[in-house]
Design a protein with these regions (language model features):
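Structural microenvironment flanking redox-active thiols in thiol-disulfide oxidoreductases
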Residues: 18, 28, 56-65
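Charged, surface-exposed interaction regions in soluble eukaryotic proteins
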Residues: 49-52, 77
Length: 118
């Protein structure tokens, strides 16, 4: 199937952008099968997610940014505190889009459009 030039945004663009606006960070590695599953959930909209590649290009080490963040498993998602909480929430493993919605307040609609709940 050849990739064509699509007009308009991908179905999950607004949701992915909302995750980034809310401060969600996704840490992964290019060689990680579960990261590939997570990426597939977003499709073309993955480019709008705040993704941090943790693997060195030779896949034998971890980049300093991920060492400093304490990342030990992939995929890992960090979410900033939502009042009254004061600490970052970290979840490890493939997350369903609905879970990401709950963690951020970004609404996942049937059309893929997202809005923020008050």
């Amino acid at each position: 199937v050849a990739a064509g030039s699509n007009s308009g945004p991908a179905p999950l663009d607004a949701f992915a952008s909302c995750l980034t606006e809310k401060g969600a960070t996704y840490y992964g590695a290019f060689w990680c099968p579960n990261c590939q599953k997570q990426n597939a959930m977003f499709g073309k909209s993955k480019k709008l997610v705040n993704y941090v590649e943790c693997s060195t290009p030779d896949s034998k080490g971890q980049l300093q940014v991920c060492i400093d963040a304490g990342i030990t498993n992939y995929p890992t998602w960090d979410f900033p505190p939502i009042a009254p909480a004061t600490t970052t929430t970290r979840v490890i493993g493939v997350q369903e889009l609905e879970t990401l919605s709950q963690m951020t307040g970004c609404v996942l609609s049937g059309s893929g459009a997202a809005t923020t709940t008050p």
